[in-house]
Amino acid sequence: MKRLPLLLLFLALPLHAWTRASDLKIAKKAIEMGPPDLRLVLDRYAPEFQRGLQKAESDEGSAEHHYFVLSRTGNLRTRIDLETKAIISMIHGRQSMAVVAERLGMLSHLIADANNPFHTADDDRRLGVAHDDFEQYFERRMARFPTVFYGLDPQFRPSSYFDKTFARTRKFYPLMSEEYFRGGTLRTSADFDDRSTAFGVASVCYSHAVTDLVNLYYFIWKEAGGDVRSAAKMRSSDGRALNAN
């Protein structure tokens, strides 16, 4: 009976991916580090970009927002590819940059999903009730996450790059099982501190989401014929991660 209030707490949480605040912080940091000309565009069309984030969230919980690596189910992986190609085509076709900004907002949300362990694996059925708790925890602790930029991939290709993204994020999922059921009983994020496994996973997922988005922004802008000369200084000469705070 002691576990009933805990379960009720989980059930009371809204069903989301990363929260809107989390999505915005990831996107804003990536825009700040992206191609300067693209940054000017997205600053000018910030309302449209944010509307894109909101649109992407509208069908959250559907197969469009997950790709479970082991079972190969869900459309998130394919949707990232399709949105990337569509945006490049729109820029080439001289579509309104307001519309492009909106689609980039949608794509930004999808990249954040790809860096969420709960969107890349579902093989521990016990964790279903912890999904939204972890995402709320991510938002609460986000101000304490350093932004570690892992660099631009000089050989960036969306397909192979995001294969690695999904494989990496999926490896964090067992750590969620370990954290939420440490000691054999269900816990909540109220039990976690900044030395916890959950904090470490959340922090790393944040930095990888920013890094992935910066890489994708540079790729899109380059493929669309934009100026990406700033890419040279975004690469670490010795391959080490860069602290971007």
Per-region residue spans from a language model:
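N-terminal, motif-rich segments that launch catalysis or mediate targeting to/interaction with membranes
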Residues: H16-E102, T120-N245
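Sec-dependent N-terminal signal peptides
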Residues: L4-A12
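Short alpha-helix carrying the canonical HExxH Zn2+-binding catalytic motif
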Residues: V100-S108, A112
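Secretory-pathway/luminal and periplasmic proteins that interact with or process carbohydrate-rich
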Residues: I111-T120
